[in-house]
Amino acid sequence: MDKNAIKKFAVWARTELIARVSLKGVEYGITEDNIEDANADSVGGKVLTADEKKQRQALIAEINDKGYKQVMEEVAYTWFNRFSALRFMEVNGYLPSHVRVFTDEENNFKPQIITEAIHLDLDGLDMEKVYELKDAEKTEELYKYLLIVQCNALNKILPGMFQKIADYTELLLPDNLLREGSVIQQMIELIPEDDWKDAVQIIGWLYQYYNSEKKDDVFAALKKNVKITKENIPAATQLFTPDWIVRYMVENSLGRLWLEGHPDVKEQLFPTEEEQSAYAAGNRDPEDTKWHYYLEEAEQEPEVQAQLAEIRKEYATLTPDQLKVIDPCSGSGHILAYMFDVLMKIYESYGYTTREAVASIVENNLYGLDIDDRAAQLAYFAVMMKARQYDRRFFSRGIQPHVYAIVESNHVDKFAVDYFCNGDAKLTAAMDIIIKELHDAKEYGSILTVTPQDWSALYDRFAEITEDINMSRDTALRLSLIHI
């Protein structure tokens, strides 16, 4: 993996995307210093469509809430994440359409999705619009439309990565994506195609390098006694864990727990002496999932040994689906991805089929949390890509991983909470505690302790209001902090 190329692209892409997204804002009368009338029907001589007017109003509302720079940064990284995910999926043949979004089959910057536009089968695709844009030779506009439709179609199988593109995110999608020197063209040219194959870790490296300049800025400001704000904690604290450290930690925690109760499967999990020597010499097979960093336990005192023997009796009763592993600060999912590999070896040694193992790992074993929404997106994506790597039909199974961004309660709508609780004293008490404990949760992250509640009652109430007709219903259903 050419990390210099990855860094060069990611650092440049952040600056470029923020500039391009901001330029789209100017087009709609929105700059850092001035915002034209939010209810305007036209801006700069351009008449707005009903959708554009709605999207522009949503953008202005978000800027008023978070600030101009924060919103432009968020939109830029949202598109960066999507471009990276689409590139990974097209190179590995994971797109359900089997049509490349950025290149042709020879990896030339000639998007196959344009040449195959009239043959595409994507949810939400308006074929009349496709023909209209093709006939008018509006190739750039056609490409942007197809890109948005493709992202929205992927929402069905990857909702944690490809949220429905609506409002201002779509409005600020940069122009001239097909030109020489665009973010997409540079991604194709600078990062070798082979670097995208199978190793989902590339997404983590892209993410770390994308944030590197911001991280430098945060620490430079800190030296001038500028406090690190809650919004900048992710940039200041995230570090992509090197592969050997990830392997060492996972093999000697999750791996050790399993082996202490099931020592008879060592031969299936450990490398041979020849394989270990080759690995140490740098001759490494990318598909090698043997445990090269596992350390045998040191000899213990007889009393300690006896206590360990009792503990191992309990471990011996464990089945793979009973294992629960969490990365409470998951970042972009590097540790979760290797946990997946280790769990696959455990399941295989226990006699599971690949399909059964993959489904059980996602449903029963892996959990991840992060304070950073975009990192949680990438960790979610990493787990889903691991599942797809092992089971080519995984996307059709409707299974979703337990990987979440920590949600804080600072802006919870009081009226929505009142509607949700519906006068129920127990629900009201539970929600009061949750809201109090998750205030500023993104500042504290996984060190927070959430008081156990009657979660079943809360989930039952969510199910109950799903079909309600009430102005507060949608807001109440978005109280995703209940998932914590």
Predicted regions and their residues:
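Non-catalytic, mostly N-terminal accessory regions of nucleic-acid modification and defense proteins
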Residues: 1-265, 384-408
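Intrinsically disordered, tyrosine-centered linear signaling motifs in cytosolic regions
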Residues: 207, 482-483
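SAM-dependent methyltransferase catalytic region
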Residues: 224-231, 235-482
